[in-house]
Each structure stands twice: as C-alpha cells, then as structure tokens.
C-alpha cells in the first residue's frame, strides 16, 4: 500500500501540476472553453476542446492577433473498429478437454477447490486473517484479472472470500480459470 501511495505522489502529482499550469496559462490568454464546446472521447482517453468564436477573438485581442488556436478533432471509433481492437488483444480461449482436466485440475482439487454442481466451474472459500488482508488479497487478484481480461465471480464478507471460476465465453472451465486459480492459491499463501 505504501508503494502505491509513493507512486501516486511521484507520478500523478507532477502530471496534475502540469495540467494545472496549462489550464492557468490558457486562462491568462483569455481562453475559456464553455461546457457546450467541450467534447470528450472516452474510448481514446483524450479531451478535445473547441473554443467558441468569441473566445478565439478574445485570445487574438489579448495576444495582439498572434494567437494560433488549434482545433483538435477526435474521430469517434466505430463499433466495428472497437471490436477489431478487442479481438486483437484477446487470445482465443477454449474449453478444457478431458486430458487437460485430469492434468491441470487435479492439483487444484487437492488444494481445496471443488467442482460446482450444475455447471462447469470450480469454487473455493479463502479464509484470511481479517478484512484488510482479504481486501489486499482481492486487490492482488484484481490486477491479474485486468491484465488477462478474466474476472472471477467472488463474494467477500469480512475475512472470507468466496471465489467461483468459469469462462462464460466457452461455457465452462478453460486455461484462464486454471491460471486464475493458481494465482489465487499463490496470493493466499503469500498472505499466510
């Protein structure tokens, strides 16, 4: 946790200061974008500001006519482009076959994982020292979940974390579930 705070102080704070300085300098030049002229593109994580004609004229007057205002145009991504980008990032995941099940699932079953009745999934309840340790455990797992784009079904109550793993895209267990379960075991063992 301390590492995260230090990282935030050293990385985020200077960048926020740069943004604040940029905003202050644009205000001094008479550039005041209005809400109606501000457009954002969440998919590209960029902010485009289009100044009104009155704001551009005020900037030219304030700088003696030498203000060179640029308009930034974001081309919105179409659904097809977004799908193509996602498809490139995702690897094809397939359901475990019988040989892979026997080979990869058995060590997890020996470690306390159980098969869920009525669906192709595995379940385990992790009992940790207290809520802070349970939350740290979930945070560590969430980092991998985001990285591999595979999120567990879980429930937390004080020091207990119930986890169910299954891959919805293939309708059952996949190598992603095995990887996630192994990571859960490793993370839980580190916290003991």
From Swiss-Prot:
Its EC number is 4.2.1.96. InterPro entries: PCD_sf, Pterin_deHydtase. GO terms for biological process: tetrahydrobiopterin biosynthetic process. GO terms for cellular component: mitochondrion. The keyword Transport does not apply. Coiled coil: none annotated. CDD domains: PCD_DCoH_subfamily_b. GO terms for molecular function: 4-alpha-hydroxytetrahydrobiopterin dehydratase activity. Keywords: Lyase. Gene3D superfamilies: Transcriptional coactivator/pterin dehydratase. It catalyses: (4aS,6R)-4a-hydroxy-L-erythro-5,6,7,8-tetrahydrobiopterin = (6R)-L-erythro-6,7-dihydrobiopterin + H2O. The keyword Lyase applies. Belongs to the pterin-4-alpha-carbinolamine dehydratase family. NCBIfam families: PRK00823.1-3. This is Pterin-4-alpha-carbinolamine dehydratase. The gene is Pcd.
């Amino acid at each position: 946790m301390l590492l995260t705070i230090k990282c935030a102080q050293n990385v985020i704070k200077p960048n926020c200061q740069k943004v604040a300085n940029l905003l202050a300098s644009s205000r001094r030049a008479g550039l005041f974008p209005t809400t109606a002229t501000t457009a954002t593109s969440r998919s590209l994580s960029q902010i485009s500001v289009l100044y009104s004609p009155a704001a551009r004229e005020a900037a030219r007057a304030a700088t003696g006519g030498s203000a060179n205002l640029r308009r930034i145009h974001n081309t919105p991504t179409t659904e097809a482009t977004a799908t193509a980008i996602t498809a490139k990032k995702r690897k094809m995941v397939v359901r475990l076959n019988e040989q892979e099940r026997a080979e990869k699932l058995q060590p997890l079953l020996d470690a306390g994982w159980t098969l869920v009745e009525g669906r192709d999934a595995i379940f385990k309840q992790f009992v940790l020292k207290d809520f802070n340790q349970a939350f740290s455990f979930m945070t560590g797992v969430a980092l991998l979940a985001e990285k591999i784009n595979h999120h567990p079904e879980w429930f937390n109550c004080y020091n207990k974390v119930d986890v169910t793993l299954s891959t919805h895209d293939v309708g059952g267990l996949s190598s992603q579930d095995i990887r996630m379960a192994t990571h859960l075991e490793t993370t839980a063992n580190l916290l003991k």
